[in-house]
Amino acid sequence: LPVMISETAADYYHSRTPAVAREVSRASQISGIEDNSMLAQFTGHLHADVNLYENFIDLFGVKFASPLSNSGRSFYKYFLVDSTNAEGRKTYKIRFHPKSVATPVLDGEVNIDSASYALRSARVKMAKGVNVNWIRHLAIEIDNRLTADSLWFPQREKMTADFTLTKSESSKMLAFLGSREVTYSDVKFDTPIPKQILGTSANVVLSDDAISGKRVEWDSLRPYALSQKEKTIYRMVDSIQQVPLYKNIYTVLNTIIGGYYNTKYVGIGPHSKA
């Protein structure tokens, strides 16, 4: 059952000289549970930067060997399974499997542009047998596109994790799914960064509309329309909080993870003092 869904629309600015990396949040909305501190302990890691060009990828505090690593052959077996034509460009479909799960590794396939050897897309998952705390399954989707400036740029990134409080594969009562999807649109190069953006030292700033709480039309902000599944989630997340069974399950999970039980006036749990 869905318990929370959130959306953020933001403008990203990046420059090498001068070195600038800024995010300007235009709008944000959250539907579902109000106190998401318990979920944040797990889902916060879904915001990790997944760059397969790096030799190792930090996922949930664990370094996974990238399939595009310089030393990839030490960790993976590669198979050229197909050669296709994607948007008029020859593309190699390469499947890879881990040689061993003694170290954190992935499993899946990548599509490589034959002319530039750039990553066009990837569908990878945590290899079966890899042990990461709280994670039962992990899947990553990456799509890149060729821009007008002949540069490959991220188009879509999605990470989905199956979190669990037990190690049993069959456990459903103490498990939940978390998913994060990012879509990049309206990419521009060689465009001057506004002076007000350069003048702030904060990596993340709020736009004037976000600060004022101005009501926004999300349909105009989204680069794509919500799927039917996402629309259904929005309708369900608010109503489900009134279901007694849901309240009881959330209270139990919050107590197990947080170590204490909140009442109206006090929190009941272990006592400690410094």
Where are each of the predicted segments found?
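Short, solvent-exposed aromatic-acidic interface loops
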Residues: 124-129, 158-166
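Surface-exposed extracellular loop regions of Gram-negative outer-membrane beta-barrel proteins
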Residues: 114, 118-123, 269-274
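Structured extracytoplasmic
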Residues: 1-93, 97-105, 161-269
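Short, hydrophobic/aromatic-rich segments at coil-to-beta transitions
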Residues: 87-95, 119-123, 151-156
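Outer-membrane beta-barrel proteins
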Residues: 127-137, 141-144
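Active-site and channel-lining beta-strand-loop segments
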Residues: 96-98, 108-114, 123-126
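Extended lipid/amphipathic-ligand handling interfaces
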Residues: 108-110, 114, 139-149
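Short, surface-exposed coil-to-beta transition loops
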Residues: 104-107, 136-141, 177
